[in-house]
């Protein structure tokens, strides 16, 4: 298996531009939906790898799965498979690597997806940041990775049910030689049972399943069109709503797409073209809007297919993110197109550096001398949860909850102190931050609407002359604390106020 999730072919912008077809672009108002809103239509879906393991975590794979090139040895500068370094402060268990200490002097440790608390933390982040549905990636489970991947499916189900997120199985056909028979066998014998979960995604009343990799012009996906069509139709015959993770240029059958696969693509209920490695700036996003996305939507409309294009944050290590401007432009453009859903590529893809999950915000949280870039790589400070917050706002715009705007409304760092009261997830004003709160009374619901989750806050900044009275219960009940100055550490208060805030009054 390759070290990155998938092998990508460079897309030629010039070729794509030459292939644009006059008269195929549709406005959002002219793009009818093939399906009504469900668990993928009208929703923000995130691709979830869940494929990291560490020596000593108890996973059957028994190694540093996807963290290092040689899984038998801990990751180090010479044995590295990471494109970005995660912010690990929210995990209860982490594992020592062979990297030098972080810039802040702390040991360089990584999380394991095999720990249930890790998966729970990720799904809690999804809950807090408007990620409706998670697509669990499932590569060939018939080899040595199978037992660990089976365990991850169970862990994802548990987390999804705990945090109220929908999930579905997303098969990846890469390097799967006996895919035609084994994918059907795996669904029948193992994965279909997960559709009994109340949190398993349904669309049009059918359980959702995705197949990624059909039609790609790559040697490790050389499945004949007839085989691909057989598998798609088999899943549809099982009563599934089938999504196709297809090449970028599926419609024209060029570049990353093999020719002669259009019947395969049109057999899917929803099409989700891949975008990682295709754009690196706002101009690239606009090019695809003008020359690809609108034409894709028109084709999907003509064939009654739902359209779920990818949104990428950008490769952090290559400097593509533009502190969120690249990602926001895609949210803006695709909302204008009138797409039926959006697929975030990816939630936890630290290998390719295209993750939205919490990431090292500065050199203080990256191993010294590693060369791994932090979120502030272009000189703009960003909080570790910035791309989660950006995804939340992009989803709100897509759903019509905030106005359509080309101007990114999400600040890379939430300003604190002068504009209002700001609560923080961690002590010392670290981690995620809520919105700056004006004077007034805030129930649990009001705080949550401002990004302050229940029993979540660990520190607060308070403007001079302001007073905050915090309560441990909703509607200003329970234990109360009154502050008229910044509080950097709720654990030091008497009584302890850490993770206790449920409502508050600000005057």
Model-derived features: positions:
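A broad structural signal for short, well-ordered beta-strand segments within beta-sheet-rich domains
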Residues: 23-26, 39, 268, 456-457, ...
